[in-house]
Amino acid sequence: MNAEDILSEIQDIMRDVFDLDDLVVTPNTSAEDVEEWDSLSHVRLIVAIERKFKFKFKNSELDSLKNVGDLANVVKSKTA
């Protein structure tokens, strides 16, 4: 899976988790950009990504995430 495919999958997951059908994400999108992105929805997002891509994040990986691009990079490294 390439970076664009991963970003597209993450966008679909985020649309579902945040209930925003028209949400468009870029690698620079962060929690500050999405009003619905609070601590509870963040947990739901992480769980949904883990289920979709069939892996578990390490706490250190989660701590280092600053935006969707960072998230996509971790997913890519875990699914390569």
Predicted regions and their residues:
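Phosphopantetheine-dependent thiolation modules in NRPS/PKS and related acyl-activating systems
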Residues: 2-37, 41-46, 51-80
